[in-house]
Regions:
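Glycine- and small/polar-enriched repetitive beta-structure motifs of secreted/surface proteins
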Residues: 1-172
């Protein structure tokens, strides 16, 4: 830390690279360790927001949540490896182990449940609620899936709504 202000770091190598970043909280081994100028981030758990450099206003709770995030803003990840591969995707919310795991640049997505929106990479404005809802979605946008494995096989189909157990399961 050189000129950063109002930072809190607990845990080995937490906030190690911080230079001018401010209002960050890092709690856990290597949490926010790559942060240089990012600000107003909260990281709780082993390797949370580990690769963040300049991203701000992110919240990561759970081992390796938002691990790959570098410059993205306004993301919330709660659960083991939620939003794990996210780098620049902004304004995403993931709750549940592996939720939005593969997301890289997709924005404005909400995933709640174990592996919900798991394969999403660039798809935007999707909502998935339930165990593996919208699991296979990669690039599709504007989908809503509520229920266990709803829209499970969907990869590129957009503007779909599915509600119930395995609703629109085979839609691609």
């Amino acid at each position: 830390n050189t000129t950063g202000n109002y930072n809190v770091a607990t845990g080995r190598l937490a906030l190690t690279a911080n230079t001018t970043g401010y209002n960050n909280t890092a709690n856990g081994y290597l949490s926010l360790s790559g942060n240089t100028t990012g600000y107003r981030n909260s990281a709780y758990g082993y390797y949370t927001l580990q690769q963040n450099t300049t991203g701000g206003h992110n919240v990561a709770v759970g081992m390796e949540a938002l691990y790959s995030n570098t410059t993205a803003y306004l993301n919330t990840a709660v659960g083991y490896r939620s939003l794990y591969l996210n780098t620049t995707g902004a304004n995403n919310t993931a709750s549940g182990s592996g939720a939005l795991y593969s997301n890289t640049t997709g924005a404005n997505n909400t995933a709640s449940g174990y592996y919900a929106l798991y394969a999403n990479t660039t798809g935007a404005n999707n909502v998935a609620s339930g165990y593996q809802a919208l699991y296979s979605n990669t690039t599709a946008s504007y989908n809503t899936a509520n229920g266990m494995k709803a829209l499970y096989s969907n990869t590129t189909g957009s503007q779909n709504t599915a509600s119930g157990y395995q609703a629109l399961y085979y839609n691609t």
